[in-house]
Design a protein with these regions (language model features):
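Phosphate/pyrophosphate-binding loop motifs in nucleotide- or prenyl diphosphate-using proteins
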Residues: 1-191
Length: 191
């Protein structure tokens, strides 16, 4: 039986982008798409952990699903930077997406008294997963910037701002999840 997943076309170290062009798997575009996929998977894991720990409706669960859908908008923007395949594009990150992300972070942060020092460790698995997701968001941001710098005429300031806010959101979400159980993250001790 022939696999529907394995094609063997990437065995030489190249892969095709959405726009049809072939790139090395270490090209800035592929690095950006790959780290975005990692962010998507970590966001999904966090969402599933929240569903398991908080049966019923928790607004954060729905918001994480919303973010996951937006990751696909970002991915198609990166994979087709010159819009050669508009039929595959479902839109792009707009100001209203950025505002919704900022509003959600502000909602969570308004209920917190954040520590004045660096966080050494989360206090439970779900908050730790939020921290891992924040790290993935920062990694993706670096790859997105590298791709932007390597791609002439690719300038997406709203998308870049959105990507920049993601790690802040996940950090605040982690602290919010700890606060909701009366726990606080382990802050760095003074030297």
């Amino acid at each position: 039986m022939k696999s529907k997943v394995t094609t063997g076309k990437g065995d030489a170290g190249n892969t095709k982008a959405l726009d049809g062009d072939a790139f090395g798997k270490n090209h800035p575009m592929m690095e950006a798409v790959g780290t975005l996929d990692m962010l998507r998977a970590q966001t999904a894991l966090l969402r599933l952990q929240l569903q398991e720990q908080y049966p019923g409706e928790l607004p954060e669960i729905n918001f994480l699903l919303y973010l996951s859908h937006l990751y696909f908008l970002i991915g198609t923007t990166i994979s087709d930077p010159y819009i050669r395949k508009p039929e595959w594009r479902r839109g792009e990150i707009r100001k209203e997406h950025l505002l919704r992300l900022e509003e959600e972070q502000e909602r969570l942060e308004s209920e917190l008294n954040l520590p004045q020092s660096f966080i050494v460790s989360a206090t439970d698995m779900v908050a730790a997963q939020a921290d891992i997701t924040a790290v993935c968001a920062r990694t993706f941001e670096r790859r997105f910037v590298a791709f932007s710098e390597a791609t002439p005429d690719f300038y997406m300031p709203v998308c870049l701002a959105f990507v920049n806010r993601l790690s802040d959101y996940f950090f605040v979400l982690g602290r919010h999840l700890e606060h909701g159980r009366g726990e606080k993250a382990v802050a760095r001790a003074p030297a």
